[in-house]
Swiss-Prot record:
Its cofactor is a divalent metal cation. It comes from Shewanella woodyi (strain ATCC 51908 / MS32). NAD(+) binds at residues 72-73, 146-147, 157, 174, 176, 187-192. Keywords: ATP-binding, Cytoplasm, Kinase, NAD, NADP, Nucleotide-binding, Transferase. It is found in: Cytoplasm. Pfam families: NAD_kinase, NAD_kinase_C. Disulfide bonds: none annotated. GO terms for molecular function: ATP binding; metal ion binding; NAD binding; NAD+ kinase activity. One of its GO terms (cellular component) is cytoplasm. This is NAD kinase. SUPFAM superfamilies: NAD kinase/diacylglycerol kinase-like. The active site is at residue 72. InterPro entries: ATP-NAD_kinase_N (IPR017438), ATP-NAD_kinase_PpnK-typ_C (IPR017437), NAD/diacylglycerol_kinase_sf (IPR016064), NADK (IPR002504).
Length: 292
């Protein structure tokens, strides 16, 4: 029976003892089964000289499965790069909540063994593309799996901006910022700010104002194909930013326009058979179990 995957990439949180232990265990276990293993260069040095070390771009190009060991933050960082390649991604949870990391670190063998035999479910998650435009020219751009957030930089204060959906004016805002989230990100920063949870199969985005200076401003859900434009008032101070997944920061100046839209790239998540999104929500968010 042919293998579902031939070349497997290992990615993890650098300088983390628990992650290093799990990566070494994975490397040994997978090598004994005859897989070709590539290790992302930031963690390869901690695993000894026998590892085949590559950068993340080469790993994405050469592997057909990537195993990310860490928390959701590590998964997000890897996903923004790997989404451009034809590669499946599965996670081993070494973080806190772990909405995107299905496998337990101490007993991954059974579930991962089934996945490697072809017994798995595939789920696609779309990404956001964020661009900062200044005087009609694009100054910077990046992608996000969870959310793009306009905010005032290091010191929290109110900012003024206008919101357009498909070039239609929606409203002006005086707030600490704006979160534009995918369904994947709806259980992250957006949830903490009062946004609704969107199931992963929804083709939608949610806009969540951060501490708006009005009682009538509420989160709104729009079609995923909508083009969102945030126009920053020229009266704002400097040092504004747009953050992508809380990792990548794009500088924003007064008068800039931020364009947020669905990316052509998408993440191919691999889940063990029987994966249930609502079970994940109950487990991670402490929801009540069935009464009868």
């Amino acid at each position: 029976m042919p293998k579902a995957f031939q070349t497997i990439g290992l990615i993890g949180k650098p300088n983390h003892h628990g992650t290093n232990l799990t990566l070494k265990r994975l490397h040994h276990w997978l090598t004994m089964q005859g897989f070709e293993i590539l290790v992302e260069e930031r963690v390869a040095a901690e695993m000894g000289p026998k590892c085949n070390s590559v950068d993340l771009l080469e790993l994405g190009d050469r592997c057909d499965l990537a195993i990310v060991v860490g928390g959701d933050g590590n998964m997000l960082g890897a996903a923004r790069v790997l989404a451009r390649f034809d590669i499946g991604v599965i996670g081993v949870n070494r973080g806190n909540l772990g909405f995107l990391t299905d496998l337990p670190p101490d007993s991954f063998e059974a579930a991962l063994g089934d996945v490697l035999e072809g017994k798995f479910e595939t789920e696609f998650r779309f990404l956001l593309e964020t661009e900062v435009h200044r005087h009609g020219n694009m100054k910077s751009s990046n992608t996000a799996v969870n959310e793009a957030v306009l905010h005032p930089g290091k010191v929290a204060h109110m900012i003024e901006f206008e919101v357009y959906i498909d070039n239609n004016f929606m409203y002006s805002q005086r707030a600490d910022g704006m979160i534009v989230s995918t369904p994947t990100g709806s259980t992250a920063y957006s949830l903490s700010a009062g946004g609704a949870i969107l199931t992963p199969n929804l083709e939608a985005l949610i806009l969540v104002p951060m501490f708006p200076h009005t009682l009538s401003s509420r989160p709104i859900v729009v079609d995923a194909c909508s083009i969102i434009k945030l126009v920053v008032s020229p009266e704002n101070g400097d040092n504004l930013e747009v953050s992508c997944d809380g990792h990548v920061m794009l500088p924003v100046l007064p008068g800039d326009e931020i364009i947020i839209k669905r990316s052509h790239e998408r993440l191919r998540l691999i889940h063990p058979k029987g994966h249930n999104y609502f079970h994940v929500l109950r487990n991670k968010l402490g929801w009540g179990s069935k009464l009868f």
